[in-house]
Amino acid sequence: MYEEFLKQIEEFMFIEDKPEKADVIFVPGNGYPQMAEKAAELYRNGFAPKILPSGRYSITAGRFTGVLDKKECYCGTYKTEWDFLKDVLMQNGVPEEAILKEDQATYTYENAIYSRQVTDREYLDIKKAILCCKTCHARRALMYYKLLYPDTEFFVSSCCVDSIDKNTWIMTNDGIDEVMGEITRIIKQFSLMLKKN
């Protein structure tokens, strides 16, 4: 029973799809370069014509707190998560004209809301989309993007940036705290969504 319950948690939390050709690649805001690097690789391999990184900074910090990994590669002065993610994309071969701009979001739900505003303003019909996000963040990010794009088929392409993934989360207290914290946020935030509808 215990092992089965753990497996159910892992299947719910850790989403990884085989990407298909899409209309856009979404990258929710963060200070890690890996998600934008993966988005750039997918772009270079012809999976989508546009990438939409999204983010100002975390609402809890009130400012962009800086690059969290590979600082030797990405050492610019970034005011927003979008500035940082754009630089990562361009350093990894994505032309500026393929990068859409959303630099106001301060949390995941806003990433989805403001991304929808951008794609609507650009008259983009998003039938299929790839979502590049942190491994632990995949379920919550997908929940919000799916809410704002209910008719879009999503493919999650996640990155393990903090050594917490489907195979390792249960091995450390940090991993357990991260996954259980995400589950708690999903439950709380989804309950608020249900009450609004």
Where are these regions (language model features)?
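C-terminal capping/extension of enzyme domains
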Residues: S163-N197
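A structural signal for short, hydrophobic/glycine-enriched beta-strand patches
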Residues: M1-G175
